[in-house]
């Protein structure tokens, strides 16, 4: 489940054993043939956890900027990602039925927002509300991912009416049957209500719309941006903002030499069951308990995953098996196998399946080049939190401020050409020094956590939940400042066993993200 708030996290992972507990690598090779996929793929060789020396995918990728862009789009699991994106959601309104069309040949727009997800709709609505002439461009697709959220965060956004179910308690299981209570209410968001609310804001603010894919953004001699669409329409605008998801490398430039992107994958099902051990009054944030009951660990058990469970009633639940983060994408079929094995071990018998979900979230990777003239927002702007895998709350909360900066830029430059220095003001709003320090900290942790097996991750959480409550709750809620995160790390260091301290020091010295984190923190 893609979560609007913070569901799972990857700041640091440690082992309490005498040596680091590293993940074993088992190659899982699948061959697929894609002939009718719009991305121009011919064939893909996928490795679910193969050796680092093997290529993760070999394909013709006409619509991707490079290998990294392809991985962000779905990589070896792209068929499942497409299945998720193209689900039928008849209850959600079509944008083309609610928004007026962009008027072709009727002068330049102030702003074009490319992408129709939560980030794109929110930014378009907020910008138009400030008096800008805003056009929204992108495929007319519904919201298909299930969303979970800390209730107070959505209340702060004025979106409490979009929550369809609330659990007053949220719990975590590690390696026994005694749960850790989070002490914070958690909600399930209605995809339909969220889509309708953001669309309503676009309608009321006067956003126009074109259902099309964008091929390129170029600059005209007069300084206008020319947004070329695949239907041969070219939309002129004073400024273009890309909000079309993480795989936006053909429209944006990213910093060279940054960390390799990792991926969080999850397979979920909403089902009717005969019986369930989960309390309908409690949302299960993470369940890392052993579910195999086998003395000899199987292939599936070597991949660290946890169960995420939303019990709407005693018999209707949403289950999701999640791989926190991995350098090599964990395949959905393996996640499904693990989920079914887990449910079987728990004695849960499925009577009816209402929906399947394939959640694919790129985490980490490089920041956009903040010198470029085109802007970005949401996942395209690397706003996905490396420690949680989510970006929607940040996108929705920062849309008003970002729109205000864009409006101010355009007001100041009414008779001037938009240039990189002006665009830099908007980039600095998204990525001020404080945000960069936080991100550097989380990237360091992400590089650490992908090394560990299930027991190593459990070891981390046993230490994590010994921290002061404000610390681990603040981490889960993404409210800790960069200074707080330093205190977080120091406290973890103090209460951890000696082997953990040694391991953290070695990782800080040997991994490039350690040097980057220190350098970023030392910048004035």
From Swiss-Prot:
Annotated compartments: Plastid, Chloroplast membrane
Description of the deletion phenotype: Delayed greening and virescent seedlings.
Pathway(s): Carotenoid biosynthesis; alpha-zeacarotene biosynthesis; Carotenoid biosynthesis; delta-carotene biosynthesis
Membrane-spanning residues: 441-461, 475-495
UniProt source species: Arabidopsis thaliana
GO biological process: carotenoid biosynthetic process; xanthophyll biosynthetic process
Pfam families in the cross-refs: Lycopene_cycl (PF05834)
Keywords: Carotenoid biosynthesis, Chloroplast, Isomerase, Membrane, NAD, Plastid, Transit peptide, Transmembrane, Transmembrane helix
Catalytic activity: a carotenoid psi-end group = a carotenoid epsilon-end group
Enzyme Commission number: 5.5.1.18
Protein name, per record: Lycopene epsilon cyclase, chloroplastic
Domain of life the protein comes from: Eukaryota
Keyword tRNA processing: no
SUPFAM superfamilies membership: FAD/NAD(P)-binding domain
Transit peptide region: 1-45
Gene: LUT2
Binding locations of NAD(+): 111-139
PANTHER family, sorted: LYCOPENE EPSILON CYCLASE, CHLOROPLASTIC, PTHR39757
């Amino acid at each position: 489940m893609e979560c609007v708030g913070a569901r799972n996290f990857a700041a640091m992972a440690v082992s309490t054993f005498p040596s680091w507990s590293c993940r074993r690598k088992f190659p899982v090779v699948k061959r697929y043939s894609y002939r009718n996929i719009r991305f121009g793929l011919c064939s893909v060789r996928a490795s679910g956890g193969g050796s680092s020396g093997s290529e993760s995918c070999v394909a013709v990728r006409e619509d991707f900027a490079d290998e990294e862009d392809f991985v962000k789009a779905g990589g070896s699991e792209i068929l499942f990602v497409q299945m998720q994106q193209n689900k039928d959601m008849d209850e959600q309104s079509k944008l083309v039925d609610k928004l007026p069309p962009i008027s072709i040949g009727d002068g330049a727009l102030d702003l074009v927002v490319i992408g129709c997800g939560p980030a794109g709709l929110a930014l378009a609505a907020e910008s138009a509300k400030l008096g800008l002439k805003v056009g929204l461009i992108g495929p007319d697709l519904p919201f298909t991912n299930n969303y979970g959220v800390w209730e107070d965060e959505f209340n702060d956004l004025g979106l409490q009416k979009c929550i369809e179910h609330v659990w007053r308690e949220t719990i975590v299981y590690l390696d026994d049957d005694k749960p850790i209570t989070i002490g914070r209410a958690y909600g399930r968001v209605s995809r339909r209500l969220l889509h309708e609310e953001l669309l309503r804001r676009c309608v009321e603010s006067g956003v126009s719309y074109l259902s099309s894919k964008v091929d390129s953004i170029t600059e005209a001699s007069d300084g206008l941006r020319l947004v070329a669409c695949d239907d041969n329409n070219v939309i002129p605008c004073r400024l273009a903002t890309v909000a079309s998801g993480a795989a936006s490398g053909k429209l944006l430039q990213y910093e060279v030499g940054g960390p390799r992107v990792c991926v969080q994958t999850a397979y979920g099902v909403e089902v009717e069951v005969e019986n369930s051990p989960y309390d309908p009054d409690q949302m299960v944030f993470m369940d890392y308990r052993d579910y195999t009951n086998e003395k000899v660990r199987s292939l599936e058990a070597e991949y660290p995953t946890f169960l995420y469970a939303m019990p709407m009633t005693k018999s209707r639940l949403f289950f999701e098996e999640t791989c926190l983060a991995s350098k090599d994408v964990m395949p959905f079929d393996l996640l499904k196998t693990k989920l079914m094995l887990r449910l079987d071990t728990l004695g849960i018998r499925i009577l009816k399946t209402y929906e399947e979900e394939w959640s694919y979230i790129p985490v980490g990777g490089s920041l956009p080049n903040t010198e470029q003239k085109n802007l970005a927002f949401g996942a395209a702007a690397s706003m996905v939190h490396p420690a949680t895998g989510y970006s929607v709350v940040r996108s929705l909360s920062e849309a008003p401020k970002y729109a205000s900066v864009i409006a101010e830029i355009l007001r100041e430059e009414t008779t001037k050409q938009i240039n990189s220095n002006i665009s830099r003001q908007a980039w600095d709003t998204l990525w001020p020094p404080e945000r960069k320090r936080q991100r550097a900290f989380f990237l360091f942790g992400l590089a650490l956590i992908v090394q560990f097996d299930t027991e190593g991750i459990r070891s981390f959480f046993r230490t994590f939940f010994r921290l002061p409550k404000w610390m681990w709750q603040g981490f889960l809620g993404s409210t800790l400042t960069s200074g707080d995160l330093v205190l977080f790390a120091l406290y973890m260091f103090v209460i951890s066993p000696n082997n953990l301290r040694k391991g953290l020091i070695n990782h800080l010295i040997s991994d490039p993200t350690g040097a980057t984190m220190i350098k970023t923190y030392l910048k004035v």
